[in-house]
Amino acid sequence: MDLREVALVLIGGGTGAVARYYLSGVLPVYRSFPVGTLLVNSLASFLLGYLYGLIFWGLDVSRESRLFLGTGFCGGLSTFSTFSYETFSLIREGEYLTALLNIFANVLATIFLVFLGFVLARR
C-alpha cells in the first residue's frame, strides 16, 4: 500500500466528512424529513457519478484525483455515493435484476442495521 495514496484518501475523506457535518447541520429538518442527509447523499452521488462519467467519456483523470475525490471526498461525504454509482453501473450494463437486488439489499440491510445498532445500544 502506497502511503501517498493513503494520505490522499485520508485528506479527501476528512474533507468530505467535514463537509457532510457542516451541510447536514445547517439545513433544517422539514416535517421530520432529514433534508441535510438527503442533500449530502445526493451531492456525493452526483459528484461520484460526474467523476466516473468524465472517466467513462474519455477524460484522463489521474489515479491520485480518483483516490482523493472519489474514494476520499465522496466516501467521506457519503458512502451512499458508492452504492448509487454501483447501482447505476449495473443499470448501464443492462443488469436490471441485479441492480434491483442491490437496491433492496442495501436499503433493507442498512435500515435493519440501524435498528439493530439502536436496539443493542439500549442494552
Curated annotation (Swiss-Prot):
One of its GO terms (molecular function) is metal ion binding. It catalyses: fluoride(in) = fluoride(out). InterPro entries: FluC. It comes from the Archaea. The chain crosses the membrane at residues 6-26, 38-58, 68-88, 100-120. GO terms for cellular component: plasma membrane. Na(+) binds at residues 75, 78. GO terms for biological process: cellular detoxification of fluoride. The keyword Ion transport applies. Pfam families: CRCB. The keyword Acetylation does not apply. It is a multi-pass membrane protein. Fluoride-specific ion channel. Important for reducing fluoride concentration in the cell, thus reducing its toxicity. This is Fluoride-specific ion channel FluC. It comes from Pyrococcus furiosus (strain ATCC 43587 / DSM 3638 / JCM 8422 / Vc1). The lineage of its organism: Archaea, Methanobacteriati, Methanobacteriota, Thermococci, Thermococcales. The gene is fluC.
